[in-house]
């Protein structure tokens, strides 16, 4: 490799030099305004996130309450059906199976409620 000759170097392009005030108004002010808008947007978004999370937790809590209510209603319905069908008769395998299913559903609903409460607790701290 040979060294470059001074003549071979490209001459720098002439750049229009602006007055400091023009430079500030033309280039820096728009950037500053854009940055302020970005900061304001991020601040608003940061403020909305906890509200959105609380809304989701509220929805989950309502859903769990509905599930628990449905489980209790179906359990009560199954018990009423069994009592109406054969009041004094001994319970059969279907009745025992229905009781087991109702207990499993109640346990699942309770676990879901506990999960939501843990999530709420971790979100609040």
UniProtKB/Swiss-Prot annotation:
The keyword Nucleus applies. Belongs to the MORF4 family-associated protein family. Found in a complex composed of MORF4L1, MRFAP1 and RB1. Interacts via its N-terminus with MORF4L1. Interacts with CSTB and MORF4L2. The keyword RNA-binding does not apply. Residues 76-99 are annotated as: Disordered. One of its GO terms (cellular component) is perinuclear region of cytoplasm. It comes from the Eukaryota. Keywords: Coiled coil, Cytoplasm, Nucleus. Residues 94-124 form a coiled coil. It comes from Rattus norvegicus (Rat). This is MORF4 family-associated protein 1. It is found in: Nucleus; Cytoplasm, Perinuclear region.
């Amino acid at each position: 490799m040979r060294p470059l000759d001074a003549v071979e170097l490209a001459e720098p392009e002439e750049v229009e030099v602006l007055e400091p005030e023009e430079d500030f108004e033309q280039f820096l002010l728009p950037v500053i305004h854009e940055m302020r808008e970005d900061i304001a947007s991020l601040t608003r978004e940061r403020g909305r996130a906890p509200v959105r999370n609380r809304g989701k937790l509220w929805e989950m809590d309502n859903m769990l309450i509905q599930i628990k209510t449905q489980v209790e209603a179906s359990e009560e319905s199954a018990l009423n059906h069994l009592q109406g069908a054969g009041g004094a008769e001994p319970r059969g395998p279907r009745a025992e199976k229905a009781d087991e299913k109702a207990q499993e559903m109640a346990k699942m609903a309770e676990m879901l409620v506990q999960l939501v409460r843990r999530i709420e607790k971790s979100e609040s701290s």
